[in-house]
Amino acid sequence: MMQDLRLILIIVGAIAIIALLVHGFWTSRKERSSMFRDRPLKRMKSKRDDDSYDEDVEDDEGVGEVRVHRVNHAPANAQEHEAARPSPQHQYQPPYASAQPRQPVQQPPEAQVPPQHAPRPTQPVQQPVQQPAYQPQPEQPLQQPVSPQVASAPQPVHSAPQPAQQAFQPAEPVAAPQPEPVAEPAPVTDKPKRKEAVIIMNVAAHHGSELNGELLLNSIQQAGFIFGDMNIYHRHLSPDGSGPALFSLANMVKPGTFDPEMKDFTTPGVTIFMQVPSYGDELQNFKLMLQSAQHIADEVGGVVLDDQRRMMTPQKLREYQDIIREVKDANV
């Protein structure tokens, strides 16, 4: 029973589906046929509506030429106006009853033709050509104002450069001081004139103390100094005191002399000096002088100072060497 019922349901469903398909196909076919039938009517209605709209517009604008072309049915009138048709679209439109009253409107195109020819003959240009006598008359007064203008123009031109020259005059003294700084390097030539100099060093005790005379005497003798002229010590070319003196040692306290018996002697320091030029090589003598000062300072517990009694520096030593070279070059 279940199988029979299922088979019946399948058959009924298939029949229903086929019926639906046939019904849909038939309805679509019917709609298409009705659309094709209604199209020519719609086209005719649309054409009529367009023609009626064009006629209304033409009536509003009052165009005479279009009305003439569309109203004429006679062959004689058609031949006269065929050449003047501006738009071929009106030939295919059927004449309607509304176009019949356009016949009396043929007068406006005829009235338009005469005004076109009327402006052509009117040429008043020939009359001013016949006036040659008036042209030379204005030329003569034109020459007269030209001459005073030319004469007045150069007057301000000459007056303008005069203040310009005055402006350049104060500029001249500005250029004058320029050669003045050129003369400044002239004093540089004074350096070669130095043909002699004195190199000074000091060996001093520390601040608030003094050098012991006995230690000072031993250190001076070890450095090669010998007591001699002016009651001071001298360093000669040879350690035994023979030969010329290279540099000398004096007391820092005035009058700068020494007493050979210096056991009970004290002093804040001693001064070593060398006169340039001297015997032999001055630079080598300067090195020997510096070594002697350092030896004495180490022995007595003092320090080496420059000529200003300041701590000796490498820059000051180079300055001493430059002075020695300068004096040597001046004495060549």
From Swiss-Prot:
Cytoplasmic topological domain: 28-332
Alphabetic keyword roster: Cell cycle, Cell division, Cell inner membrane, Cell membrane, Membrane, Transmembrane, Transmembrane helix
Periplasmic compartment residues: 1-6
Stored CDD domains: ZipA (cd00231)
Transmembrane segments: 7-27
Signal sequence residues: none
GO CC, alphabetical: cell division site; plasma membrane
Biased composition (Low complexity): 99-115, 123-150, 160-175
Record-level GO BP terms: division septum assembly; FtsZ-dependent cytokinesis
Alphabetized InterPro entries for the sequence: Cell_div_ZipA, ZipA_FtsZ-bd_C, ZipA_FtsZ-bd_C_sf
Matching SUPFAM superfamilies: Cell-division protein ZipA, C-terminal domain
Database matches in SMART domains: ZipA_C
Record localization: Cell inner membrane
Known role: Essential cell division protein that stabilizes the FtsZ protofilaments by cross-linking them and that serves as a cytoplasmic membrane anchor for the Z ring. Also required for the recruitment to the septal ring of downstream cell division proteins.
Oligomer and partners: Interacts with FtsZ via their C-terminal domains.
Name used for this protein in its record: Cell division protein ZipA
Source organism of the structure: Escherichia coli O6:K15:H31 (strain 536 / UPEC)
Gene it is expressed from: zipA
